[in-house]
Amino acid sequence: MHRTYPLPSTLKQNVTAYTAKSGSKTYHGTYPTKYRTAAVHPKTCGKPSSGTKLKYGTQIYTVNELYLPGFANGYKDDFLVEDMGDVNCSKGFSPYWFDIYFGVKGSSTDKNAKTFGLKKNVSYETY
């Protein structure tokens, strides 16, 4: 696949991690996939009906691999937009922030998500 340099909107963004209850579906109606599904802001803050800022199915490729606690391979650089998060854009994240699904809520997955924490200055490309 041919990759180009990231657009300015995807430079120096925030990345976080989340877990969800068993059986939870994403904003787009799919079941999230551990360490693959990404949630993004809505197009219009406070209006989930506006859709996701990055369209459903957008592939996110981080310029540098991210260390994902609990992930078998340790590092990963590709994620898929399937969910919406921070609907009111009230958490102070960058405009093109994304949130990586770390699995079903539980002591180990919650711990891994918390350990991942908030990553700043993450640049990525989308396809």
Locations of regions flagged by a protein language model:
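Solvent-exposed, well-ordered loop and adjacent helix/strand elements within mature globular domains
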Residues: 1-127
